[in-house]
């Protein structure tokens, strides 16, 4: 946390608001559905339904850590092939459960993240 605070303090010198761009990347690539990632030649493992609440909570924990470090805002990145984007896009979300299919269903994971 001290190193993050030092980064945040550098932003304090100017008049710009401090924010952190949040992305969660793990060692094992996971996605909305199993298959090759459209943005790289990586094969991703589709997240199981029971894993989704913990993943959404991880976003929430990251936001709390950023707040503790003194950031004013957090960007939830939901584009360009990142995890939330994979749930939103019919090209990467081939799920057959309540997280796939209609736009409302594909938005369900993003809604979980925002609630955290």
Please annotate each region the language model reported:
Residues 47-50, 54-57, 82, 105-112:
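Conserved active-site and cofactor/substrate-binding residues in soluble primary-metabolism enzymes
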Residues 1-65, 69:
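Non-globular sequence segments
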Residues 1-2, 74-76:
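Hydrophobic faces of well-ordered beta-strands that scaffold small-molecule active sites
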Residues 76-77, 85-89:
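Non-cysteine beta-strand/loop elements that form the S-adenosyl-L-methionine
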Residues 14, 85, 97:
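An active-site metal/cofactor-coordinating segment within enzyme catalytic domains
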Residues 4-7, 78-82:
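Glycine-rich beta-alpha junction loops
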Residues 65-72, 112-116:
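A structural motif corresponding to the C-terminal end of an alpha-helix
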Residues 1, 88-116:
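Alpha-helix-loop-beta-strand connector modules within alpha/beta enzyme cores
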């Amino acid at each position: 946390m001290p190193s993050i605070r030092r980064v945040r303090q550098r932003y304090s010198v100017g008049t710009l608001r401090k924010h952190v761009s949040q992305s969660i990347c793990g060692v094992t690539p996971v996605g909305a559905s199993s298959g090759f990632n459209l943005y790289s030649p990586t094969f991703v493992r589709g997240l199981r339904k029971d894993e989704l609440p913990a993943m959404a909570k991880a976003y929430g924990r990251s936001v709390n850590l950023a707040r503790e470090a003194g950031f004013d805002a957090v960007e939830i990145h939901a584009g360009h092939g990142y995890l939330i984007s994979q749930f939103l896009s019919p090209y990467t979300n081939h799920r057959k459960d309540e997280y796939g299919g209609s736009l409302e269903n594909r938005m369900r994971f993003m809604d979980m993240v925002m609630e955290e």
